[in-house]
């Protein structure tokens, strides 16, 4: 078989699928590979997302790599080496024509703050244990969830810029990289397809099939992805675990894996100790779960505890209040899995229309609480205005609704024919095709499953 175009749309999608699995599975040890992919993509298609969006995601990935080394108890020499690699103290600043002065100022300040914070930790302060606990909390699950959402939006923009996926082209690339493996048997690829809203074929690919059309052509309603109708009539108890037969058709669960509710729907719920000794109010992501950590073949189960159930109910109530007061201006529909599970049919009409992908750019917008809404709970003298990487990742007050140049950028990229610039899935997998990226997430217990 002839070698497929390694920088074509199919290869880009496989690289995106691998990156998505790494971030989705919290595989911090592979974050540098995701950084490589994002930098390559930014170099050839700078218009996919705004500069600030790209930098927030990349800085978050780099910071998590360094923090993970610290929390694992690695030697400080190794930690500082990684710190200097990802955050060079006097490294050149990349001048992006799309970057504003405010963007550059915030990014530079966040990098410097993180660098000094790690340097101070390496000097063995007397309260090292409390500092490490604070670091673990600051770069914990809310931070990772915000990064995952940033990457999802990035990949959505990439998908909008690429042509319609063709199953045969995808199979050709996968067969070249992993002989004998079908796109229907690759868990990472199936998960990516489900999350991106495709209907993957259940059988082996024998001809060129348009993966976008079956959503309208497939007659069984239960086989359709809930993108344009994310709130179908639900039978009582549909969120409960079903028999083995329900696990063979993961497509109906697509709407339950994601909710594109903006990060603005969150509550400021805790104070965070700053690196300079004061206290500042720190936003925490409190949004409907926009995907399930399990594999696409898993069904959504009930919350594990009453406390968890209360959190979901509170978040649902927040969204309902926002919709009833008329503050939700986006004409998109909710895709939240557990929100749908808690109240599948009684959501207000405005809430049902909030997060639909029919909206041109609103699902990709991070609409957050304005700064003036955050009232300090400590004296002004104790409040720190230091911007950290965690602030930039969790906070997007100034995220603009103008990311729409991806199509032109990728067309220009295709004309340049830098065929080896974008890393492909080959670089994420062992050549045998039976290896796997170790999954560090507690929700992904099978670390031997293949991509």
Swiss-Prot record:
InterPro entries: TINF2, TINF2_N. This is TERF1-interacting nuclear factor 2. PANTHER family: TERF1-INTERACTING NUCLEAR FACTOR 2. The TBM domain mediates interaction with TERF1. There is a cross-link at residues 302, 306, 341, 353 (Glycyl lysine isopeptide (Lys-Gly) (interchain with G-Cter in SUMO2)). Its main location: nucleus. The lineage of its organism: Eukaryota, Metazoa, Chordata, Craniata, Vertebrata. Detected in heart, brain, placenta, lung, liver, skeletal muscle, kidney and pancreas. GO terms for biological process: negative regulation of epithelial cell proliferation; negative regulation of telomere maintenance via telomerase; positive regulation of telomere maintenance; protein localization to chromosome, telomeric region; regulation of telomere maintenance via telomere lengthening; telomere assembly; telomere capping. The keyword Phosphoprotein applies. The modification N-acetylalanine is found at residue 2. It is found in: Nucleus; Chromosome, Telomere. Coiled coil: none annotated. GO terms for molecular function: telomeric DNA binding. GO terms for cellular component: chromosome, telomeric region; nuclear body; nuclear matrix; nuclear telomere cap complex; nucleoplasm; perinucleolar chromocenter; shelterin complex. The modification Phosphoserine is found at residue 295. Keywords: Acetylation, Chromosome, Disease variant, Dyskeratosis congenita, Isopeptide bond, Nucleus, Phosphoprotein, Telomere, Ubl conjugation. A motif (Nuclear localization signal) lies at residues 262-268. Monomer. Found in a complex with POT1; TERF1 and TNKS1. Component of the shelterin complex (telosome) composed of TERF1, TERF2, TINF2, TERF2IP ACD and POT1. Interacts with TERF1, TERF2 and ACD. It comes from the Eukaryota.
């Amino acid at each position: 078989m002839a070698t497929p175009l390694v920088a074509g749309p199919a290869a880009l999608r496989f690289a995106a699928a691998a990156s998505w699995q790494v971030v989705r599975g919290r595989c911090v040890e592979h974050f540098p590979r995701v950084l490589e992919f994002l930098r390559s993509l930014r170099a050839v298609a700078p218009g996919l997302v705004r500069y600030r969006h790209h930098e927030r995601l990349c800085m978050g990935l780099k910071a998590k790599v360094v923090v993970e080394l610290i929390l694992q108890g690695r030697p400080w020499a190794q930690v500082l080496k990684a710190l200097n690699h990802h955050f060079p103290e006097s490294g050149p600043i990349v001048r992006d024509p799309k970057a504003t002065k405010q963007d550059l100022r915030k990014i530079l300040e966040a990098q410097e703050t993180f660098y000094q914070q790690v340097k101070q930790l390496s000097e063995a302060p007397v309260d090292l244990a409390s500092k490490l606990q604070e670091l673990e909390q600051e770069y914990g699950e809310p931070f990772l969830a915000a990064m995952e959402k940033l990457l999802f939006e990035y990949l959505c923009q990439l998908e909008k810029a690429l042509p319609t996926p063709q199953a045969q082209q995808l199979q050709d690339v996968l067969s070249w990289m992993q002989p004998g493996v079908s796109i229907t048997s690759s868990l990472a690829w199936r998960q990516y397809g489900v999350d991106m809203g495709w209907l993957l074929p259940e059988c082996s690919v024998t001809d060129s099939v348009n993966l976008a059309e079956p959503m309208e052509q497939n007659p069984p309603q239960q086989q359709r992805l809930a993108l344009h109708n994310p709130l179908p009539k639900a039978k009582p108890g549909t969120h409960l675990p079903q028999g083995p037969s329900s696990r063979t058709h993961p497509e109906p669960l697509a709407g339950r894996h994601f909710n594109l509710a903006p990060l603005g729907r969150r509550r400021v719920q805790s104070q965070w100790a700053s690196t300079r000794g004061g206290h500042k109010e720190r936003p925490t992501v409190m949004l409907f779960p926009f995907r399930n950590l399990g594999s696409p073949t898993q069904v959504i189960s009930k919350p594990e505890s009453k406390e968890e159930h209360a959190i979901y109910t509170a978040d649902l109530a927040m969204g309902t209040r926002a919709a009833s007061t008329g503050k939700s201006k986006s004409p998109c529909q909710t895709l939240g899995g557990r929100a749908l599970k808690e109240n599948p049919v009684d959501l207000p009409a405005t809430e049902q229309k909030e997060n639909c992908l029919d909206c041109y750019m609103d699902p990709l917008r991070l609409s957050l609480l304005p700064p003036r809404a955050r009232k300090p709970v400590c004296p002004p003298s104790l409040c720190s205005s230091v911007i950290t990487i965690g602030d930039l990742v969790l906070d997007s007050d100034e995220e603009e609704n103008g990311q729409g140049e991806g199509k032109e950028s990728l067309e220009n990229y295709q004309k340049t024919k830098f065929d080896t610039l974008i890393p492909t899935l080959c670089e994420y997998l062992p050549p045998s095709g039976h290896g796997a990226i170790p999954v560090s997430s507690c929700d992904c217990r099978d670390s031997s499953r293949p991509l």
